[in-house]
């Protein structure tokens, strides 16, 4: 009798997360929470998202359709779920953590053009699926510290049954075949709807979803049952029988009070113990020390603070997901609950409209964005807040709006950004030299911005240096425009201080007003929200929430700030209009 073929020995386990019935079931949060639980058990965990859309990355996608673009340390523009992964695992991931159909097809077609397939007919199977497998298995590589992951959690985007997802599901099936069933685990998320008229929970959608998954060769090892209430044991037993899943692997996940409660929900259902047992991983108790402290701060705040987020894309809160999470984490650092007021920037263009929109808030956050719509409203919100001592934090475009508002306050009444008004006589925000071809339409827009982590040097004793506790920092970026250095001296007449620059002093990274001019009005060209963690809040957000609490505790008495002399336009301010911008 021939010997059975042995699978290659591997120390790394693969856990695939799929979804059925409907989208937006919380696959990303489920995967992130399970990753957090396994990490708390002392395991090395990394994560990956497979997205079935044809875009190479989400960088050029409409934020109303896709939500935010999450930028990694190495400059990849990725899905917002990668942000969940980083926040729950408390570790940085690379661009390899997000794979799209567009990336896969681009690579395969490029190989075909180079003749690497030696005349083969290039097809979805095996060529596309092989490229997907290569990217999945590449996650097994050691990190910068030389540690290989114990577990790779791979979330497959889309819904089982979608045409777009089929190559990814087939690739996952083949990974299981290659690494061995004992090294692979499939977790399927499904909806159990509650029918109010009959007062029943329905299992049929889950049964059909699992049947569709099994029809392509994948039998789930565990099921996440999403519902607005607990699924009773008799129904769990029925689902286990009809879907051929162990009863220990049928997990009820009712809606939780906050996303940070989800690990506790999964642990209560013993999902992490079941995964450890099935994959033969080292069994250690969960260390809840750090997470329990987080949950105390989430559920037992000592104070409440109201922050206005003045944005262009507020109709879809996911467009500012990392900003919102960083604000909440800043509140955790101050033992405070942050109540967010979503304010459309168009509603703040005049003093009267800004006063109406921002009347009872304790702080104003101006997030990033692109395009001219709503810009005057962002500037109007900054003007209102500056006059009244209301704390402000500006991110990326927010810094640029702070600079424009400051320039206008000292007589450069037509000051603007070259992005919004290419013909402005005072382009206080100019196009970066290496971005001019992209802006002119002579180069690709996708993946060509100033992306990823860059260092900055802060002015000693500045507000930002005090917040960070150091003068050397690194933050992630995503922009094409910068402060025009030609106007630095003129803008400084407003009192605005350029408190942080690139190490060579050329690119403005941070601006602020000194405390004697305004208690907290700070802008950064970076996106610090991308490095915030619930258990390690970002210092800028913690400082901003702290300043907002100070404003609130002063009973919101609107104190008029020292008046900045308003310069009358006399034509002299345009003497620089023909000077070449050093930006």
UniProtKB/Swiss-Prot annotation:
Task: Kindly give any further remark recorded in the entry.
Answer: CTPSs have evolved a hybrid strategy for distinguishing between UTP and CTP. The overlapping regions of the product feedback inhibitory and substrate sites recognize a common feature in both compounds, the triphosphate moiety. To differentiate isosteric substrate and product pyrimidine rings, an additional pocket far from the expected kinase/ligase catalytic site, specifically recognizes the cytosine and ribose portions of the product inhibitor.
User: What are the record's GO terms for cellular component?
Assistant: cytosol
The protein's UniProt keywords, in alphabetical order, are: ATP-binding, Glutamine amidotransferase, Ligase, Magnesium, Metal-binding, Nucleotide-binding, Pyrimidine biosynthesis
Protein species of origin: Mycolicibacterium vanbaalenii (strain DSM 7251 / JCM 13017 / BCRC 16820 / KCTC 9966 / NRRL B-24157 / PYR-1)
> GO terms for biological process?
'de novo' CTP biosynthetic process; pyrimidine nucleobase biosynthetic process
Q: Provide the family line.
A: Belongs to the CTP synthase family.
Protein name, as recorded: CTP synthase
This enzyme catalyses: UTP + L-glutamine + ATP + H2O = CTP + L-glutamate + ADP + phosphate + 2 H(+); L-glutamine + H2O = L-glutamate + NH4(+); UTP + NH4(+) + ATP = CTP + ADP + phosphate + 2 H(+)
Q: Does the keyword Iron-sulfur apply?
A: no
Assembly behavior: Homotetramer.
Annotated region (Disordered), positions in chain:
561-583
Q: What is the organism lineage in this UniProt record?
A: Bacteria, Bacillati, Actinomycetota, Actinomycetes, Mycobacteriales
Q: Any inhibitors or activators noted? A: Allosterically activated by GTP, when glutamine is the substrate; GTP has no effect on the reaction when ammonia is the substrate. The allosteric effector GTP functions by stabilizing the protein conformation that binds the tetrahedral intermediate(s) formed during glutamine hydrolysis. Inhibited by the product CTP, via allosteric rather than competitive inhibition.
Domain Glutamine amidotransferase type-1 span(s) in chain numbering: 306-554
What is the gene called?
pyrG
Active site (UniProt): 396 (nucleophile), 527, 529
Q: In which pathway does it act?
A: Pyrimidine metabolism; CTP biosynthesis via de novo pathway; CTP from UDP: step 2/2
């Amino acid at each position: 009798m021939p010997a059975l073929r042995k699978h290659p020995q591997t120390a790394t386990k693969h856990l695939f997360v799929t979804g059925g019935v409907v989208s937006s079931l919380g696959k990303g949060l489920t995967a992130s929470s399970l990753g957090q639980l396994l990490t708390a058990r002392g395991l090395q965990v990394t994560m990956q998202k497979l997205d079935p859309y044809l875009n190479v990355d989400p960088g050029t996608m409409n934020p109303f359709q896709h939500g935010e673009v999450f930028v990694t340390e190495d400059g990849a523009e990725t899905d917002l779920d990668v942000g969940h992964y980083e926040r729950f695992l408390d570790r940085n991931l690379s661009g390899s953590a997000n794979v799209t159909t567009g990336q896969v097809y681009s690579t395969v077609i490029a190989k075909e053009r180079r003749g690497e397939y030696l005349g083969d007919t290039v097809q979805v199977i095996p060529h596309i699926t092989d490229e997907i497998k290569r990217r999945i298995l590449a996650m097994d590589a050691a990190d910068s510290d030389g540690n290989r992951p114990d577990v790779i959690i791979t979330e497959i985007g889309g819904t089982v049954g979608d045409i777009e997802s089929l190559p990814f599901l087939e690739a996952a099936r083949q990974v299981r075949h290659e690494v061995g069933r004992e090294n692979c685990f499939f977790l399927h998320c499904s909806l159990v709807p509650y029918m109010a008229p009959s007062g029943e929970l329905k299992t049929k959608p889950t049964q059909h979803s699992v049947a569709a998954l099994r029809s392509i060769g994948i039998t789930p090892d565990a099921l996440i049952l999403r519902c607005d209430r607990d699924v009773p044991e008799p129904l769990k037993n029925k689902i286990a029988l009809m879907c051929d899943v162990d009863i220990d692997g049928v997990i009820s996940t009712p809606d939780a009070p906050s996303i940070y409660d989800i690990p506790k929900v999964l642990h209560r259902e013993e999902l992490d113990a079941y995964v450890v047992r099935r994959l033969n991983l080292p069994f250690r108790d969960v260390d809840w020390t750090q997470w329990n402290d987080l949950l105390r701060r989430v559920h037992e705040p000592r104070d409440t603070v109201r922050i206005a987020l003045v944005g262009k894309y507020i109709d879809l809160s996911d467009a500012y997901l990392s900003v919102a999470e960083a604000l909440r984490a800043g509140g955790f650092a101050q033992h405070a609950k942050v109540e967010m007021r979503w304010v459309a920037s168009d509603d703040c263009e005049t003093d009267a409209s800004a006063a109406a929109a921002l009347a009872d808030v304790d702080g104003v956050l101006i997030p990033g964005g692109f395009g001219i719509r709503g810009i005057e409203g962002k500037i109007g919100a900054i003007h209102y807040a500056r006059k009244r001592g209301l704390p402000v934090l500006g991110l990326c475009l927010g810094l640029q709006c702070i600079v424009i508002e400051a320039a206008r306050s000292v007589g450069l009444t037509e000051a603007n950004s070259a992005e919004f008004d290419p013909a402005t006589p005072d382009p206080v925000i100019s196009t970066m030299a290496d971005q001019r071809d992209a802006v002119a339409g002579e180069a690709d827009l996708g993946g060509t911005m100033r992306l990823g982590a860059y260092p900055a040097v802060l002015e000693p004793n500045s507000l930002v240096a005090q917040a960070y506790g150091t003068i050397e920092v690194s933050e992630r970026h995503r922009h094409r425009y910068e402060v025009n250095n030609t106007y630095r001296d003129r803008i400084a007449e407003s009192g605005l201080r350029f408190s942080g620059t690139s190490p060579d002093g050329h690119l403005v990274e941070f601006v602020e007003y000194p405390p004697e001019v305004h208690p907290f009005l700070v802008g950064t060209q970076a996106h610090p929200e991308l490095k915030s963690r619930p258990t390690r809040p970002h210092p800028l957000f913690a400082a901003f929430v702290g300043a907002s609490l100070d404003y609130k505790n002063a009973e919101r008495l609107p104190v008029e700030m020292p008046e900045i002399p308003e310069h009358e336009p006399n034509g002299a301010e345009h003497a620089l209009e023909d000077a070449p911008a050093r930006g």
